[in-house]
Amino acid sequence: MSSQKKVSSGNTTPSGLAGLASPLNDQQINLLQQISDLSPQQLAWVSGYFWGLSQSAAPSAVTPIAQAVSAVAAKPAGKLTIIFASQTGNAKGVAEALEQEAKAEGIAVQLFDASDYKGKNLANETHVIIVASTNGEGEAPDNAIELHEFLQSKKAPKLPNLQYGVIGLGDSSYEFFCQTGKDFDSYLAKLGATPFIERVDCDVDYDASAAQWRKQALEKVKDALSAGVEADVVQLPVAQLAAGHALYTKQKPYAATLLTSQKITGRDSGKDVRHVEIDLAGSGITYQPGDALGVWFENSGELANQVLAKVGLSGVESVDVDGESLSIHSALVSKFEITSSNPQQVEKFAQLSGSKKLLKLVEEKDKLREYAGNTQLVDLLAEKQTKLTAEELVGLLRRLTPRLYSIASSQTEVDEEVHLTVGLVEYDVKGEKRFGGASGYLAQRLEEGEQVKVFVENNNNFKLPADDNVPVIMVGPGTGIAPFRSFIQERDNRGAEGKNWLFFGDRTFTQDFLYQVEWQKYLKSGLLTKLDVAFSRDQAEKVYVQQRILENAAQVWQWIQEGAYLYVCGDANRMAKDVHQAFVAVAEQEGKMSRGDAEEFINDLRKAKRYQRDVY
C-alpha cells in the first residue's frame, strides 16, 4: 500500500510569524514558513507532534523549530479520525459532511479513504468514526477490503484506548443489510475498543438518519476534541469549509437538458435499451471515466393515480413534507418511492390491512425479501383493498432517492455532455405494464429539451490505470458496457498505447449488440486490440462472457502477467460472481496454482486496484 495520505484538509488564512521573538536562523525560518498555510486544526496536530518530541527529549534537545510552532499553536489537541468505506460514493459523502460539521464545531479532524488508511495506526488513535457501505452480498467495498481483512487478522493491534463510532449504509431489502458496518463494529469491539455512540444502520433514504447520528456523535466528542488553538482560531461556516467540493451535489443537483433518448436495441429485441445524451453546457461540471451520474426523477402521474385509487384517496388531500404542504398526488410524483417496495413497507401494510397472506409472509424473511424485491407499491396495495388516510399512506413510503448510472462517455470526446446507457425496466403484472422509476422517466416520460436534475458521483474504485501503456481487460455484458465506452474514448483521445480487450455479451447479435458500429470502428483502428462476444440465445446452448474468458485463458493470463488491469461492470448477483470464478480458474489453470492460492492471487489484484468492479 502506498504511504498514508489525507483526503482533504481545512481551508483557512495563514498564520503569520510576525512579532515572535525568534531563536531561529534564516534557513530555519524559511523552512518554518512552509507551514504558514496550515489550518488551525492542522497546526494543532503539528503542535502536538512537536510537544511530544519536547516531552521525550532533554530540555537542551528541544529544537528551535518546535518552540516556534508551539508559539503559533499553543497546546496539543486530540483529533477525530474519519474513515470511509465506500463503493458508489454515498459513504464518502456522509463522511465528508461529518468532516465539515466537525470543523465547524472546532474539532480537529482528518478524513481517510479506507484504502489509504493503515490499520495498525488505530493503536495511536483516540477517536475514530467509520462510515461504511456494503457491497454485494455483505462484502466490504473494494476500497475497504484490506482494512476489513486486517482487523480480522492476528496482526490487528489491541485497542483499549480507542473510542469509536460506526455508521452503516445499506438497503434493508437485502439479506446482508449494512453488514460491513456491523463487521467493523464487531471487529473493533473484539480488539478492546469502546463505542462512544451506538452504531446506526441507515437505509436507502439515509439523509435524515445519518444527519441526526452525525449531530449526536459530534456532541459526544466535542469536549474531548476541541481544536486546542488558543489564539486566532476562526470558526468557518460549513459552506466555506466545503470550498473545492463539487458545485452540484445530490442535495443540490444541476438542472441539465435532455438532448436525446435513442433506442439502440433492435425492433425485435426483448429489451429496450436507450442511449441517453444530456447537455451540461455552462455548468462547469466535470467527470472522469468510471464515475456515475446521479439522476433525480419524477414518478408517473398515472401510476400515482393508481396508487391513490387503491387506498381510496382523491389526490387533493394535503400532506406535510419537510415543512411544505403538498397534495398527496404531487408528493407521490416528486417526493416518494412508488415503483418499488421493501420488507418494512410490506410488514407495515400487512398490519394496516390485516391481510392473512402478507402477515404469513412477514414471518418468512427470505420469502418476504423476495416478494418485496419483485413487487411494486401498487401491486402490494392490491393484495387487500384498504382505505388509508394520506398520512397513513405517506407513513408506508420511503423518500425518493436518485438513481446512479455508469457514465458512458469521456469529456475528452463529448466535451460538455454526458452520455448514459439506460435499460428500461419493464414487465407485466396480471396484464398490466410496470416500469422502473428512473428508467421509465428517461426512456418514456422525459421529452427532448426538457430539464433533468443531475449530479456526478465520483467513483475512485473504478478508474483507468494512470499509465497509458498498461493493458486493460474489460468485461461488460448488457448495459454494463457503459463505462467501457468512456474508457475507450478516453484512451483514444489520450493517445494511450496500452492494449484493450473487451468481453461483451447479451441475448442476440442482431438485436442486442450495443454500440456495435463503434466497437467495430475501434477494432479496425487497432485501439481495441481484441473483442470477444457471447450472445446467449444465438445457439441452442447458452453462452456467457465467463465462458469466453475461460476459452481465452492462456491469453488472459499472459495479459495479467504483463500487468493488465481487470474491470467488470454489470449484474452483481450472477454475472460478476461467475466472472470472478472464471478469473480464479484462469489463475489456477495457467498459473499452476491451487484453488486457494488462485483465490488469493485474484484478491491480491483487487487490493492492488488491478481488479476493479462496478456491479449492481
From Swiss-Prot:
PROSITE patterns: FAD_FR, FLAVODOXIN_LIKE
Binding residues annotated for FAD, in chain numbering: 339, 373, 403-406, 421-423, 427, 436-439, 616
Flavodoxin-like domain mapped to chain residues: 80-218
GO cellular component, one term: cytosol
Keyword Zinc-finger: no
Residues bound to FMN: 86-91, 133-136, 169-178
Domain FAD-binding FR-type: 251-465
Classification via InterPro entries: CysJ (IPR010199), CysJ-like_FAD-binding (IPR003097), CysJ_Proteobact (IPR029758), FAD-bd_FR_type (IPR017927), Flavdoxin-like (IPR001094), Flavodoxin/NO_synth (IPR008254), Flavoprot_Pyr_Nucl_cyt_Rdtase (IPR001709), Flavoprotein-like_sf (IPR029039)
Residues that, per the record, bind NADP(+): 536-537, 542-546, 578
Cofactor note as given: Binds 1 FAD per subunit.
The protein's Enzyme Commission number: 1.8.1.2
Pathway noted in the entry: Sulfur metabolism; hydrogen sulfide biosynthesis; hydrogen sulfide from sulfite (NADPH route): step 1/1
Stretches that traverse the bilayer: none
Required co-factors: FAD; FMN
Catalysed reactions, as listed in the record: hydrogen sulfide + 3 NADP(+) + 3 H2O = sulfite + 3 NADPH + 4 H(+)
Molecular function GO labels: flavin adenine dinucleotide binding; FMN binding; sulfite reductase (NADPH) activity
GO biological process, one term: hydrogen sulfide biosynthetic process
Quaternary structure (record): Alpha(8)-beta(8). The alpha component is a flavoprotein, the beta component is a hemoprotein.
Cross-referenced PANTHER family: NADPH OXIDOREDUCTASE A, NITRIC OXIDE SYNTHASE-RELATED
Function, in words: Component of the sulfite reductase complex that catalyzes the 6-electron reduction of sulfite to sulfide. This is one of several activities required for the biosynthesis of L-cysteine from sulfate. The flavoprotein component catalyzes the electron flow from NADPH -> FAD -> FMN to the hemoprotein component.
Family listed: Belongs to the NADPH-dependent sulphite reductase flavoprotein subunit CysJ family.
HAMAP family: CysJ
UniProt name for this protein: Sulfite reductase [NADPH] flavoprotein alpha-component
